[in-house]
Amino acid sequence: MAMNHPLFSQEQPQSWPWGVAMYANFHYHHHYEKEHMFEKPLTPSDVGKLNRLVIPKQHAERYFPLGAGDAADKGLILSFEDEAGAPWRFRYSYWTSSQSYVLTKGWSRYVKEKRLDAGDVVHFERVRGSFGVGDRLFIGCRRRGDAAAAQTPAPPPAVRVAPAAQNAGEQQPWSPMCYSTSGGGSYPTSPANSYAYRRAADHDHGDMHHADESPRDTDSPSFSAGSAPSRRLRLFGVNLDCGPEPEADTTAAATMYGYMHQQSSYAAMSAVPSYWGNS
């Protein structure tokens, strides 16, 4: 028998169109999510010898309407699932004497098995039914001490700050006037790098002084502990003989050099003592 329906024609595969399949998949996930209905803190009478749970009227009429007829007179059997997936069946009815909606048959067994006490909380959830299937009902409970913990949000995780790098300076603040004199141009650097560069420059500067000391100056008779020896400085490829300088002036010059070097590369070069006029 030939099939003239476009879904079963020879030109197309015998399957649902892509759009229909995507809609069915979305419809399935949309209708199978748990919806929180309400919760009820248990009173001493809810867990006492009356063997019944009073459901607040506004929640009972909204989620478990009895309607009219035999359901209103005799009640209904409501089926639930607990957290472990175990089934629970309760008789649900309306008591005209107290004008309240209650769960009666099956409730006492639930209280005993879950070991519920006054102050504990029972909560109800559902999954909306679709395609002619009724709602799936769920029941759960939590202890009285867990109620505050469930409502209190967890504190945010602590943020661990990485320790500062070693030899990063005495916590110098960032300054846009820190430059590096290495390379062809002047680029901003961090204070830690600038501090390390100043220490390296000062160390190299001191080594250059000691390396260029003439042996004949240190071994000469005129050399003594009380008098400062003359030193030879090699600057820009030229050997220069430098006379003794007061120690205070040397410290001041080194301090000025470090400060000016932190400001800019040009200022660092201008802070170096010039000996061209003495040669």
UniProtKB/Swiss-Prot annotation:
The keyword Nucleus applies. Residues 38-144 bind DNA. It is found in: Nucleus. Residues 203-219 have a biased composition (Basic and acidic residues). PROSITE patterns: B3. It comes from the Eukaryota. CDD domains: B3_DNA. Residues 148-182, 203-228 are annotated as: Disordered. Residues 159-168 have a biased composition (Low complexity). GO terms for cellular component: nucleus. Keywords: DNA-binding, Nucleus, Transcription, Transcription regulation. Its main location: nucleus. GO terms for molecular function: DNA binding; DNA-binding transcription factor activity. PANTHER family: B3 DOMAIN-CONTAINING PROTEIN OS11G0156000, B3 DOMAIN-CONTAINING TRANSCRIPTION FACTOR ABI3. This is B3 domain-containing protein Os11g0156000.
